[in-house]
């Protein structure tokens, strides 16, 4: 089947609705929607839940942008895209909970297609989800990765290990020499064997996010925390900001190509702190995190 951008867009709009409904049901608060238009073509729906019962901030963004020509920053690496019109669409989300025992989560699914008359379209899917705990619980990481493995299984035995490794490699802070969290799945440039297969996989990843995350939220939401745990959470959130502003390709691409800044930076935690050369107390739960987030086979 030839690529069907309209079909993908309809799925993404439904996915945004579904994820927002499930997060809202878990939290008790509602999302506020901000619809926006892009002057050069397209637009989106940014939805944010703030200061809820569980989530300090949850942002779920849908965007669909199109144009007559790709920006130079994109065609420099992919000369075959020069002279083509393009469409890019996706759903991306980040959830920052109040409770430091609940991890931060991130998910993204996206589709890109570039066309010109008389030539085959160039298209691909990308996406994934990853988990960033502040306090490590083995059963949470195992559940997260088991959900990822199970949704990959129908697409081949090698899919989960390949995209898990890609996720571990991608969400790595080179300047800190540490992982951002316990990973999950990451894939990009997916266009084989055919459109239907790739679209089905992207849908499985998008639909799998709440199955992976919400049971962890339920398990941790009643745990009691205080100033010590909150301070550590805010300190570790600094790593999240560092990764997004220094290393994340999507953030950099969006900012460099005149994307909508408010939507791009919706992933940022609302509060964060840095402290010069801070070291956790030896033997403490905070000190245990650095070992917990080391790359390993969780399932």
From Swiss-Prot:
The GO cellular component terms are: cytoplasm
The enzyme's first-digit EC class, named in words, is: oxidoreductase
Q: What is its main location?
A: cytoplasm
Q: Which InterPro entries match?
A: Coprogen_oxidase_aer, Coprogen_oxidase_aer_sf, Coprogen_oxidase_CS
What are the protein's GO molecular function terms?
coproporphyrinogen oxidase activity; metal ion binding; protein homodimerization activity
Positions bound to a divalent metal cation:
96, 106, 145, 175
Cofactors per UniProt?
a divalent metal cation
- Identify the residues that bind substrate: 92, 108-110, 258-260
Q: What is its EC number?
A: 1.3.3.3
Q: Which reaction does it catalyse?
A: coproporphyrinogen III + O2 + 2 H(+) = protoporphyrinogen IX + 2 CO2 + 2 H2O
Q: Where is this site: Important for dimerization?
A: 175
Keywords attached to this Swiss-Prot or TrEMBL record, sorted alphabetically, are: Cytoplasm, Heme biosynthesis, Metal-binding, Oxidoreductase, Porphyrin biosynthesis
Region (Important for dimerization) location: 240-275
Query: GO BP, one example?
Result: protoporphyrinogen IX biosynthetic process
> Do you know which Gene3D superfamilies this protein is assigned to?
Coproporphyrinogen III oxidase, aerobic (3.40.1500.10)
Which PROSITE patterns does the annotation name?
A: COPROGEN_OXIDASE
**Keyword Chaperone: yes or no?**
no
Q: In which pathway does it act?
A: Porphyrin-containing compound metabolism; protoporphyrin-IX biosynthesis; protoporphyrinogen-IX from coproporphyrinogen-III (O2 route): step 1/1
Q: Where does it live in the cell? A: Cytoplasm
This protein's assembly is summarised as: Homodimer.
Its biological function?
Involved in the heme biosynthesis. Catalyzes the aerobic oxidative decarboxylation of propionate groups of rings A and B of coproporphyrinogen-III to yield the vinyl groups in protoporphyrinogen-IX.
Give the family per the record: Belongs to the aerobic coproporphyrinogen-III oxidase family.
The record ties this protein, via NCBIfam families, to: PRK05330.1 (NF003727)
Protein name stated in the entry? Oxygen-dependent coproporphyrinogen-III oxidase
> What is the source species?
Salmonella schwarzengrund (strain CVM19633)
